[in-house]
């Protein structure tokens, strides 16, 4: 890949730390009394902090590959940071939900293993590594989806697993076909092989692999599990499953197409642009009629993936594409977690039940407003800057028609987000109605992530410079 090859496992400190923490937590949890299993949360939180420090140090080093299959570059380092921050927020968000639960340890362990798979997806520079990372980012999250063992959660988990099983088989078939066409698994060698091999067979293999990555990202047409998971599982689980795997999957999407698939052999730009259009449009249309806050957030994540795929569609055509994708992913992770954290705080799943929220808890109502207007892309939130950068990259990459569609979808999305925001600032119809006490940890996460999305938006220029954006 034109990079030096590093055979020192020390280059993988963030990944190793997550793995060791997960295994240690699993073993310790089996012997720790239920009332003391909060120590597993502390261990996991410390592991994420160590991983973030190691990531910051590693980001100063030149780009390289580890064992020739795992790429350490700006995209991988940024993915590490985003995923680890998301895991830290999710550990805190889950505290009120899982404390004292008989499967408390399992939640944290599965979250860490799934996060490890997401990071591995982003760094994969080899087809075999890509498939192994796909499995690691899948199996723990299947189990996490059914963690609560409630009726709706079990149904959602079963749908998620069955769709994932099909996606896994499809991905394996695609990897096999691409290997057969190219005669190699290293991305750069795959690109050379595809240039000389039968384009039709390579296209079939590529579509199969992209179908698997689309499932992990929750992109159309492999998005059907997203609203069911969002509504059927506890909010911390829903937040994890609609945030963490998407990050790695979209970076993997970008790296695979930009490095391994020659656009001259297969017109993957058009394929990706069509997926982006379908995602943002169908996600918005489905969200319009929702009365469930969680289901609305689920469809919202589908539309957000559509916008993110715009950057993938112009990969390699403009230097703005990768920084825009990475900034948007960071902004999306914070904003999406903030939305689910508000629901976890209030314990209210219906939009009309948020009436009077501002009078009961002004700060939480403001956090909800920041989260939802952030998902629209309203300044000064980070999603606004991320979306603006992606629109600019798409224009620079010659996809002006896609920018027009995205702008129209952005305006349309304001309608259903306002349907949730407006009741929060109206007086409650019945002040004497019983209100469930808010979850302390979830409220703290909602306020913190909402504040961070504003800070990231304000400081986005510094972040973009660090990510290598030009101009």
Swiss-Prot record:
It comes from the Bacteria. GO terms for cellular component: plasma membrane. The keyword Transcription does not apply. Its main location: membrane. Its EC number is 7.1.1.-. It is found in: Cell membrane. It catalyses: a quinone + NADH + 5 H(+)(in) = a quinol + NAD(+) + 4 H(+)(out). GO terms for molecular function: NADH dehydrogenase (ubiquinone) activity; NADH:ubiquinone reductase (non-electrogenic) activity; quinone binding. It is a multi-pass membrane protein. GO terms for biological process: ATP synthesis coupled electron transport. Keywords: Cell membrane, Membrane, NAD, Quinone, Translocase, Transmembrane, Transmembrane helix, Transport. The chain crosses the membrane at residues 11-31, 39-59, 81-101, 105-125, 127-147, 162-182, 200-220, 234-254, 270-290, 296-316, 324-344, 365-385, 398-418, 444-464. PANTHER family: NADH DEHYDROGENASE. Belongs to the complex I subunit 2 family. NDH-1 shuttles electrons from NADH, via FMN and iron-sulfur (Fe-S) centers, to quinones in the respiratory chain. The immediate electron acceptor for the enzyme in this species is believed to be a menaquinone. Couples the redox reaction to proton translocation (for every two electrons transferred, four hydrogen ions are translocated across the cytoplasmic membrane), and thus conserves the redox energy in a proton gradient. NDH-1 is composed of 14 different subunits. Subunits NuoA, H, J, K, L, M, N constitute the membrane sector of the complex. This is NADH-quinone oxidoreductase subunit N 1. It comes from Streptomyces griseus subsp. griseus (strain JCM 4626 / CBS 651.72 / NBRC 13350 / KCC S-0626 / ISP 5235). The lineage of its organism: Bacteria, Bacillati, Actinomycetota, Actinomycetes, Kitasatosporales.
